[in-house]
Amino acid sequence: MVIGLTGGIASGKSTVVDFLISEGYQVIDADKVVRQLQEPGGKLYKAIVETYGLDFIADNGQLNREKLGALVFSDSKEREKLSNLQDEIIRTELYDRRDDLLKKMTDKSVSKNFDSKSQGKNLSVNKPIFMDIPLLIEYNYTGFDEIWLVSLPEKIQLERLMARNKFTEEEAKKRISSQMPLSEKQKVADVILDNFGTIEALKKQIQRELARIEEQK
């Protein structure tokens, strides 16, 4: 079973992912995969240099993600350009990792440390795997048995983003408005995890859904 996990910026997906991993579930983290692909010599790194030149390469040779992010979030045309550039590379890599993990589980092998966030627990072949993809709905990723959405009111999302990233209100609103509204994503999701309360309340929702899946086996 493959579950797609998504949500808006500062919605709390990382909290969900950390909890799932602590419970022994395997999570393919799209943001982490992208960062790996953006390392010097990686497929995305090469594609960005070929498209933008060295303007977004820092003195240490690393990709200047902050500078690149500022460009794409302030210019919708550049955002679309970069998204199209990266989409095929990222999509292929994510599906390859999913297929690799499913094969290992089908072969009943025990996989450790597939993701660097893993706590090193032995993973049961009967457990679902999760794919944490921020733009899962926007880019029409498929192949999931269920889609889980981490959601919260926009006011709380705005406050959390400002606090987490030290953004001004204007900067935070611009980032949020660049994404599909959570209200629209809710129409597609099979499970909605409400993250406007405490972490413990969020964990209880996750445990309830995991128990439901276990009962369906």
Swiss-Prot record:
Pfam families: CoaE. Belongs to the CoaE family. GO terms for biological process: coenzyme A biosynthetic process. CDD domains: DPCK. InterPro entries: Depp_CoAkinase (IPR001977), P-loop_NTPase (IPR027417). ATP binds at residues 10-15. GO terms for cellular component: cytoplasm. SUPFAM superfamilies: P-loop containing nucleoside triphosphate hydrolases. Its main location: cytoplasm. It comes from Lactococcus lactis subsp. lactis (strain IL1403). Residues 2-217 form the DPCK domain. Signal peptide: none annotated. It is found in: Cytoplasm. Its EC number is 2.7.1.24. GO terms for molecular function: ATP binding; dephospho-CoA kinase activity. Catalyzes the phosphorylation of the 3'-hydroxyl group of dephosphocoenzyme A to form coenzyme A. Pathway: Cofactor biosynthesis; coenzyme A biosynthesis; CoA from (R)-pantothenate: step 5/5. This is Dephospho-CoA kinase. It catalyses: 3'-dephospho-CoA + ATP = ADP + CoA + H(+). Keywords: ATP-binding, Coenzyme A biosynthesis, Cytoplasm, Kinase, Nucleotide-binding, Transferase. The keyword Cytoplasm applies. It comes from the Bacteria.
